[in-house]
Design a protein with these regions (language model features):
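Conserved NB-ARC/NACHT P-loop NTPase core of NLR-like innate immune receptors
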Residues: 1-204
């Protein structure tokens, strides 16, 4: 999976500098891996393992809910995540969400997919200078429409055998010449994106 390569490359960077990564794989076959509750819980557990301060924030949430006898609601989980992300010693934080399209979608009623897309928007709206969010998904119309309003950039990969070099050239040109990316992303971030996507371009 392309997200696995992205995560692997980010982890390599985290080993050499002040950065953190948290990731989540949605799964249409597992209800526990759909919607925002599992996502938020997983992101918190990964990020709170990084420092005592972030762990203390999580413990505070745990204490408020009778030391685990009650389940925090999704709003409480999100507010706790915001507090953790505000800790400066995390450095740059990469959040990777894979296969958003595997959240079910039923038109006309609230769905896990809509909740996830709203959460992504709220994370982007934090405008945190050290947060980088990567979302992968099939290009389904509702997801495209939601993410287009929040994404600083998107890369679409569709290839047949033999087109890998063309895709790599396309990725490199987008990352290197897009003015918005040039202004917002550091050189090492741009290189990380190119390397990660290029390694998995074949057959996408």
């Amino acid at each position: 999976m392309i997200s696995s390569s992205i995560i692997k490359n980010i982890k390599s960077e985290c080993e050499t500098g002040l950065a953190s990564v948290a990731y989540y794989y949605f799964d249409y076959k597992d209800k526990d891996k759909q919607g925002v509750r599992g996502l938020l819980s997983s992101l918190l557990s990964q990020l709170c393992a990084r420092s005592q301060d972030s762990y203390d924030i999580l413990q505070s949430l745990y204490g408020i809910h009778q030391n685990g006898l009650e389940q925090p609601n999704e709003g409480d989980l999100f507010q706790t995540l915001k507090k953790v992300l505000e800790l400066r010693h995390h450095g740059r934080v990469y959040i990777v969400m894979d296969a958003v399209d595997e959240n079910p979608n039923t038109h006309g009623i609230p769905t896990p997919r809509e909740d996830v897309l709203q959460l992504i928007k709220e994370l982007v709206d934090l405008r945190h200078p050290d947060i980088r969010i990567c979302v992968t998904s099939r290009p389904e119309e509702d997801i495209k429409m939601a993410l287009e309003r929040s994404a600083s950039h998107d890369v679409s990969l569709h290839a047949q055998e033999g087109q890998r070099s063309d895709i790599i050239d396309y990725i490199r040109s987008v990352v290197e010449f897009d003015r918005n990316i040039q202004q917002k992303w550091r050189a090492e971030d741009r290189k990380l994106v190119v390397d990660s996507l290029s390694k998995n371009a074949k057959g996408m």
